[in-house]
């Protein structure tokens, strides 16, 4: 870790509180001059740091510059050793994570970015990824066999909701299976993919990618997405902490994807219960009413005929097709 990153990580742990120059120098085994230079470098990068004589330095609660050091400082102690690869801009964090996985990146590796130039959603759809967002992918290494990717997606959706609620008064909800909504608009999408080793033909890893819309100015939302895409605009929201909280929960949940509490939490946050939806099955347009979510994470839909279908995948729209 560089001197600059070490200073940032220390300030991140005490965000909103003054830390004296001598304390920083002593705890990090640095000279006062080295601390001062690191502070100047961080300010030049856009971090909001207040310096007051006889008080020290304070990383402001409104400072929201995403960084590897900031994410690392916000991770729980047991996940502090996770490797973090940060990009200001990248094509896709999932693409980078797949490459790293095939190169031998360990379980728990985190890939994060402030902007994606080729973000992807399900079925290869483009994912709007402006530079104010949070795009984070976690590499998971199954100990044996292939876990149900839908349950990983479920864990990620719950992780996003919990992480947002930990920092704000916002109450996000989940639209089956992989979208998080706020006030009727999509603020997060999730893409879970398997990484296949071409030589062995086996599953090398699973990457779970999460894209969160943060502080997007209304004028930057493309016309075709107006009224559909929303944004987290809470004061004091830290993307570094959001990334750390999401990654930590996904890693914890991965150890027990069948835990009843996980699917119960997912059900509680779903806003589709009782709503009429439209979907396609084998090319046929169908409509029905959502009656629940199974323990496996399937969407239960009652058709007009009285038959109940269990949907394990696919897109659903609110209202009739």
Model-predicted regions and their roles:
Residues 2-165, 188:
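N-terminal lobe of the biotin/lipoate ligase/transferase fold
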Residues 88, 174-176:
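Short loop/edge segments at beta-strand edges and connector loops
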Residues 1-30, 40, 44-45, 145-148, ...:
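Long, positively charged amphipathic alpha-helical accessory segments at protein N-termini or as interdomain linkers
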């Amino acid at each position: 870790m560089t001197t600059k990153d070490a200073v940032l990580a220390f300030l991140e742990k005490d965000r909103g509180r003054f830390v004296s120059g001598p304390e920083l120098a002593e705890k990090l085994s640095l000279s006062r001059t080295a601390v001062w230079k690191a502070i100047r470098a961080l300010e030049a990068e856009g971090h909001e740091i207040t310096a007051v004589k006889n008080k020290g330095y304070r990383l402001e609660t409104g400072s929201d510059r995403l960084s590897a050091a900031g994410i690392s400082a916000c991770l729980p102690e047991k996940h502090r050793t996770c490797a973090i690869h940060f990009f200001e801009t990248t094509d896709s964090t999932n693409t980078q994570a797949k490459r790293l996985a095939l190169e031998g990146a360990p379980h728990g590796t985190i890939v994060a970015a402030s902007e994606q130039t080729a973000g992807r959603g399900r079925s290869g759809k483009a994912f709007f990824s402006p530079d104010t967002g949070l795009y984070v992918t976690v590499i998971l290494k199954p100990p044996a066999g292939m876990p149900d990717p839908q349950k990983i997606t479920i864990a990620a959706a719950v992780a996003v909701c919990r992480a947002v609620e930990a920092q704000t008064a916002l109450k996000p909800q989940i639209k089956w299976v992989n979208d998080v909504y706020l006030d009727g608009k999509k603020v997060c999408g999730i893409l879970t993919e398997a990484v296949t080793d071409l030589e062995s033909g086996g599953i090398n890893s699973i990457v779970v990618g999460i894209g969160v819309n943060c502080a997007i100015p209304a004028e930057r939302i493309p016309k075709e997405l107006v009224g559909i895409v929303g944004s987290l605009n809470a004061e004091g929201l830290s993307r570094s902490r959001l990334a750390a909280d999401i990654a930590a929960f996904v890693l914890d949940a991965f150890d027990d994807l069948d835990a009843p509490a996980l699917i119960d939490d997912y059900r509680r946050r779903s806003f589709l219960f009782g709503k009429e939806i439209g979907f396609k099955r084998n090319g046929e347009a169908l409509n029905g009413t959502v009656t629940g979510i199974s323990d496996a994470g399937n969407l239960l839909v009652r058709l007009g005929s009285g038959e109940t279908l269990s949907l394990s995948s696919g897109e659903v729209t609110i209202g009739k097709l």
